[in-house]
From Swiss-Prot:
Keywords of this entry: Cytoplasm, Elongation factor, GTP-binding, Hydrolase, Nucleotide-binding, Protein biosynthesis, RNA-binding, rRNA-binding
Taxonomic lineage from the root: Eukaryota, Fungi, Fungi incertae sedis, Microsporidia, Unikaryonidae
Listed pathway(s): Protein biosynthesis; polypeptide chain elongation
Species assigned in the record: Encephalitozoon cuniculi (strain GB-M1)
SMART domains found in the cross-reference section: EFG_C (SM00838), EFG_IV (SM00889)
Record-given protein name: Elongation factor 2
Functional note: Catalyzes the GTP-dependent ribosomal translocation step during translation elongation. During this step, the ribosome changes from the pre-translocational (PRE) to the post-translocational (POST) state as the newly formed A-site-bound peptidyl-tRNA and P-site-bound deacylated tRNA move to the P and E sites, respectively. Catalyzes the coordinated movement of the two tRNA molecules, the mRNA and conformational changes in the ribosome.
Length: 850
């Protein structure tokens, strides 16, 4: 790696004021990776002449498809001019001119949104990239919402100016209007996102927005053009720069000439989009250069750009047209320079960010030792260690690197640490809790460098790091600490769900062991992918969408199992629910007939289901407070909640409604275990239950504990929960996509017909300005989405396309009483695919009688 030393990175890791941890986020194909390449080249990680580009896309399928599939990190070392820092940052906010940029390039395709979530969790700022022609698209909104949920500060890059100028040939006036609309649209969207965390509008005149062509490697903020014109306006210094920057974005003033160097030009207080300061002083010079490049007038280009103090020394300008324009523009306005300034000046350091995020990130009390250390980003040797592992990255030795962020303390090789899995709560001695703790030693600490990694001696708070040696005790994510009383860092909340699944098997029976090992590694490597094995021995993989599933199957066969596999047709992930309550207690007996359990069930309020993950707590008092403050619910039963399930993403409750049973707490863990087992394996089609509140009403128990152990109680509780679901009007919930279809106006009718034929809805029609295109937004059941894009292209001669993202779960139409209904047919088909008995069991088959 030319001119790059890992020792310099480690030195800068100690200077928290000058660390910038950032994610690059965008809609697919909006140009994130090409912009990232500009920064990597600027940092001299690779040479500007190295072919291919897309340095951060290390996978072969990423290079072939031209999209990012896995987020990848790199640590870059940059310098910013001292006078610029002094002028545009507060005193004390920075320390020196050298900056460490820990950058994560994340995917733009909606199927890989979980990778974006994992990146945002460990960063402090986001570089949001938006195609200036297409504007905010469905995935832009998704990732921006994720950033707001994680309390990440954004800054905006309006990219692909080359597309507007060279390909679509926008006139200056139109481009100026489009860019202004993009800024306004972004800020309007920003204002609607986030609940407890709001950020102010981003403004070009504050240099919070840059205008770039990542493909050609050029870009600018208004500050750069303001500096060009200081002499013309008889101004100097940074105060003059600020005034000119405000002037350049003003829409209330217009110019009397198109030539920025016309000596007679005047500025009048009358709006005129064709002669706004931005068009005249910023866009017109760029279009002038384009015209000269088209005619191959190299000497005239050099002469014209003397006005802007451009030095072409060492730059060979030849040819004409697009290639010459690219060379001239990236020499005049290098994209890396303006983006670097944005990152250094407008995004927060860990010291600033963690003051905003600590109370959201940390599950424990906001004033305990660990919370205070996170808040202050304390990286001293004495500080408690708190690190969050957001994903596991495969290494070359068939193991995994635990990748994450150190929020407090310092981590080094040989250090003794506690690895706490999601769901752990300090103070609880229940087996289900203590099994989530692992005492380990750190073998190595490494920084990620795109396609590889480098060892560092240690890592203090505020940095992104990889740890080697703990992959055997982390399934996907977790908290690392060195304090017994430390609570977990909050688990991530994904914007997508694993709604598409497929059954997989080994092509050769003798490869079953390798398949199982490969499935475990696949589940560990992907933040969202869920691998399950049912009691019939069938393995399934659940993913966010069809592309995510395709990638996971390829990785399973080629990278993890390394054996031929067979994949069945894809299914969608359903939830099992109920439509009514069962208020008369139902009963089951233990195998020895000495114990009886009585329960009822009722549907949970949807508001509780949607927010259960955020309000749950192991402490009854805290739980009651959370329900009251966040959901405005004050019911007495809240203090009697025994258990939530599933554990990671709870959707159901078990409440203790018994009275006067002195030994009831002695069976609590056994009942909870049976409840969890039932919730994860519903009786209809073996899927997870959703929105059920089970209440334990009574228990008749043997006096001797040996006769009421878990072996006696687990199965009766499991049976009771399953039977209650079947007795309460069982329903299925199916996943629904929000769909955004772009189609020529002439085909909007045909496209709408296709959408409606697949049980979709068309909720909004918007004509896009300037290109005779309609955008249709609506919903589409995931089950109907597998061939949707192909059907659209067939019905529009290849001219329509759709973007889809997970929206919500909705009740599947029909019922189990009508053989012609969709629900009946779905239950029948899924049970057949899962090799279950064709008809669901009856409620009474699970209950016992006195």
């Amino acid at each position: 790696m030319a001119d790059f030393h890992i020792s310099k990175v480690h030195e800068l890791m100690m200077n928290q004021k000058n660390i910038r941890n950032i994610s690059v986020i965008a809609h697919v194909d909006h140009g994130k990776s090409t912009l990232t390449d500009c920064l990597v080249i600027k940092a001299k990680i690779v040479s500007k002449d190295s072919g291919g580009g897309r340095y951060m896309d290390s996978r072969e399928d990423e290079q072939q498809r031209g999209i990012t599939i896995k987020s990848s990190a790199i640590s870059l070392h940059f310098q910013v001019q001292k006078d610029v820092l002094e002028a545009y940052t507060k005193e004390g906010d920075t320390n020196g001119t050298e900056f460490l940029i820990n950058l994560i390039d994340s995917p733009g395709h909606v199927d890989f949104s979980s990778e974006v979530t994992a990146a945002l969790r460990v960063t402090d700022g986001a570089l949001v990239v938006v195609d200036c022609v297409d504007g905010i698209c469905v995935q832009t909104e998704t990732v921006l919402g994720q950033a707001m949920n994680e309390r990440i500060i954004p800054t905006l890059v309006l990219n692909k100016l080359d597309r507007a100028i060279l390909e679509l040939e926008y006139p200056q006036e139109k481009l100026g209007e489009v860019l202004r609309r993009r800024v306004e649209g972004f800020n309007a969207k920003l204002s609607t996102l986030g609940y407890n965390f709001k950020v102010e509008s981003l403004l070009p005149e504050k240099n919070e927005i840059s205008f770039c062509s990542g493909l050609q490697g050029w870009g600018f903020t208004l500050r750069q053009f303001a500096r060009f014109y200081l002499e013309k306006f008889n101004m100097n210094g940074f105060e003059g720069e600020r005034k000119l920057t405000n002037f350049l974005w003003s829409h209330k003033v217009s110019c009397t000439s198109d030539d920025p160097f016309d000596a007679s030009i005047k500025h009048i207080a009358k709006p005129n989009p064709a002669r706004s300061p931005f068009v005249v002083y910023v866009l017109n010079p760029i279009y002038k250069v384009k015209e000269l490049c088209n005619n191959g007038k190299v000497e005239e280009i050099k002469e014209y750009l003397k006005f802007y103090k451009v030095d072409f020394k060492g730059v060979v300008l030849t040819g004409s047209g697009k290639s010459l324009f690219k060379e001239v523009m990236k020499t005049w306005l290098p994209a890396a320079d303006c983006i670097l300034e944005q990152i250094a000046l407008k995004l927060p350091s860990p010291l600033q960010s963690q003051k905003l995020r600590y109370d959201y990130l940390y599950e424990g009390p906001a004033d305990d030792e660990v919370a205070n250390a996170i808040k202050m980003c304390d990286g001293s040797d004495e500080a408690p260690v708190s690190m969050y592992v957001s994903k596991m990255i495969p290494s070359n030795d068939n193991r995994f690197i635990a990748f994450g962020r150190v929020f407090s303390g310092k981590i080094f090789p040989g250090m003794k640490i506690r690895v706490q899995e999601p769901g752990y709560s300090p103070g609880s001695e229940e087996l289900s809790n203590t099994s989530l703790i692992h005492n380990k030693s750190v073998l190595r600490t490494v920084v990620m460098m795109g396609r590889g990694y480098k060892d560092v001696p240690n890592c203090p708070a505020g940095n992104i790091i990889g740890i080697i040696g703990i992959d055997d005790c982390l399934k996907k994510t977790g908290t690392i600490t060195n304090r017994e009383a430390a609570h977990n860092i909050r688990s991530m909340k994904f914007s997508v769900s694993p709604v598409v699944k497929v059954a997989v098997s080994a092509k050769r029976p003798e490869d079953l062991g390798k398949l199982q090992e490969g499935l475990n590694k696949l589940a560990q490597s992907d933040p969202l992918c869920v691998v399950e094995r049912n009691d019939k021995g069938q393995n399934t993989i659940a993913c966010a969408g069809s592309l995510h599933l395709e990638i996971c199957l390829k990785d399973l066969q080629d990278q993890y199992a390394k054996v031929p596999i067979i994949a069945d047709d894809p299914l969608v992930t359903y939830f099992e629910g109920i439509s009514c309550a069962v208020s008369d207690s139902k009963m089951t007996k233990s195998a020895n007939k000495h114990n009886r359990i009585y329960m009822t069930v009722e549907p949970l309020d949807q508001n509780i289901v949607d927010n259960l993950k955020d309000v749950k707590s192991d402490q009854a008092k805290t739980m009651a407070t959370n329900f009251r403050e966040k959901l405005d619910i004050r019911d007495d039963w809240i203090r009697k909640i025994w258990c939530y399930a599933p554990e990671v993403n709870p959707l159901n409750l078990l409440v203790d409604g018994t009275k006067g049973i002195s030994i009831i707490n002695e069976i609590k863990e056994h009942v909870n275990t049976g409840f969890r087992a039932a919730v994860n394996d519903g009786p209809l089609i073996g899927e997870v239950m959703r929105g059920l509140k089970f209440e334990l009403k009574d228990a008749v128990l043997h006096a001797d504990a040996i006769h009421r152990g878990i072996n006696q109680l687990l199965q009766p509780v499991k049976n009771l929960c399953k039977g209650l679901l079947l007795a309460a009007g069982p329903i299925l919930y199916e996943p629904i996509y929000e769909v955004e279809i772009t189609t020529p106006n002439d085909y909007s009718g045909a496209v709408t017909t296709i959408l409606l034929s697949k049980r979709g809805t068309a909720e909004d029609f918007k004509t896009l300005p300037g290109n005779d295109t309609t955008m249709i937004t609506g919903t589409l059941p995931v089950k109907e989405s597998f061939t949707f894009n192909e059907d659209l292209k067939s019905g529009s001669r290849g001219k329509a396309g759709a973007s889809m993202r997970f929206s919500h779960y909705s009740i599947l139409p029909g019922n189990l009483e009508d053989p012609n209904s969709l629900m009946f047919k779905t239950v029948e088909a899924v049970r057949k695919l899962k090799k279950m008995n064709p008809a669901p069991p009856t409620p009474d088959s699970f209950f016992d009688r006195l």
